[in-house]
């Protein structure tokens, strides 16, 4: 049973939430590290791990799934070239979340999420 195993809603409708997670995933893979709220960082962690696992697989079907999710096609090519060399021995846990000081305007818990 999958009781209480839901995705964080992030205070947004489903389409906006999916677009936000896609954008955060794309930017994290592009820059290697982003600053966001702690809840968003925890939500995007599973998506980034899924993209890196697809890149380690390296098959055409995995590449097409990544192209359908990430916003930048050139980024998909770079990810698929580097993932097996960078994360070849690692079985998951490709990201690290570091808590930082709260945001000034609304005191939201902030975090830095980065690729290991």
Swiss-Prot record:
InterPro entries: Ribosomal_bL17 (IPR000456), Ribosomal_bL17_CS (IPR047859), Ribosomal_bL17_sf (IPR036373). GO terms for biological process: translation. GO terms for molecular function: structural constituent of ribosome. Keywords: Ribonucleoprotein, Ribosomal protein. It comes from the Bacteria. SUPFAM superfamilies: Prokaryotic ribosomal protein L17. GO terms for cellular component: cytosolic large ribosomal subunit. Part of the 50S ribosomal subunit. Contacts protein L32. Belongs to the bacterial ribosomal protein bL17 family. This is Large ribosomal subunit protein bL17. The lineage of its organism: Bacteria, Bacillati, Cyanobacteriota, Cyanophyceae, Gomontiellales. The gene is rplQ.
